[in-house]
């Protein structure tokens, strides 16, 4: 099922690639990438499933405790968050999206070695972070409230000349905050992979995009 989702590209993620996005993935076109993806998808082993399930159970327990006191956290309705189904995919190669955790439609995608090596505490934070991105896709109106409250404004769509990294967890717009700081992750001049970027206005992922900022803030729901 994951292979079909990645190959069909119904979320049109590959359509957001510009010249630099192709270069850092070492591909000439989308067909090259589809061939790589076909060989990258794999199945979860029972140990990997257990690691994820154990983490989800702890997450749900903690959020349920908080929910009675705070029905919302950073503009995310906790009932809605808990009711969103967890869907996962696994890839066995860093050739697809450099092995970075991300979402495609409602699926959270991990790379096998990343999942093997991550601690449970870090996995819990990553799971929450990525589920926020699923929530953002499912409930755009809630996200608009967040953007309005924090006075984020859309400036323009991303263009090739901006050299901003394509990211399946984000929309394809550039935003600035109430202080007119423009948020972006820009490829370095000598970039050879997806992670060769610099964040602006400050070099931390918090400033890549308002959607990333929201997800990073929400991670703090667990301690």
What are the residue ranges of the model-derived segments?
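Auxiliary, metal-adjacent structural segments of Zn-dependent hydrolase domains
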Residues: 30-108
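N-terminal mature-domain "stem" immediately C-terminal to a signal peptide or N-terminal signal-anchor/transmembrane
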Residues: 1-49, 215
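Non-catalytic terminal regions of proteins
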Residues: 87-92, 125, 136, 141
